[in-house]
Amino acid sequence: MYQPPFKLNSEILSLATEISSLIERFVIRLEQADKLKLRKANKIKSIHSSLAIEGNTLSENVVSDIINGKRVLAPQREILEVKNALATYELYPKLNPFSIRDLLKAHGVMMHGITLDAGRFRSCNEGVFNGKKCIHLAPPPGRVPALMADLFEWLKKSKEHLLIRSCIFHYEFEFIHPFSDGNGRMGRLWQSLILGKWNPAFEHLPVENMVYANQQKYYDAIAKSSVAGECSPFIEFMLQNILDTLKQFKDIPVEEGTALANDIKLSLRQKKIIDMINDGDVTIAMIAKKLKVSERTIDREMSKLQDLDVIAREGSDKTGRWIVK
């Protein structure tokens, strides 16, 4: 089996450990965030950032207007890039990050009407450019199908942590540069998909936004890895970006005073109880039936949540209702 060249140093392992710790805190906070609003906001940021890296000049506000179906005055190609990116991100839940067929399908949507060979591997020579400077010359087109098959086989079978695999895949993808256009945006999308297999919370994390804010370091990491002949510099760069993204979003706005806002750790059952209270008026009997436990068990859990100042009872015992504070 093909083995991409990389070295796991202490910095990489330290970053991976810190990310693993922070992602769990992020998931807990996410439970009480407005996921629909967060998903939409991050989708806009992700699309704007990923396209801006590739030279799209539209502002985040204009990208938002296009996504919301408003008419805008802008170059047609740039508008099409936004619409295509949106259509591709809508496929996110259905795409298998371990499937070459799905990669080609996603590229076909992403580059529809932009390049004639959308959805197909390139038949011409390509390279990675930082402005007008070529920082990496990609392998000949005839080698692309075999190289991609090897890369996907490694991705599926490797025992490395998915967090690290996602970074290695991203670099190897850019090294191969399998398409005539759209390699950057596809590489970033595919890393997000791989990360999503490790933890679905990554659907809510606009990693592309952090890369956009550090474009020069992004290209520097690719160049350093190419010179070194192994991708440790790129792995470190991407892990640092993921960590920075998690730190940036660790304070997701939630209603002030909730357990999540105060870093109180809740059990899975307690989180389910909170979700049910948020969904509408419920009684202890209804919660017990839904969770398939005794009413006495739920009564104890509710008392704990009241003691933690997470929930409260509004009104009388007979006519009142439970609320999340």
Regions found by a protein language model. Name each.
Residues M1-K325:
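FIC/Doc superfamily catalytic core
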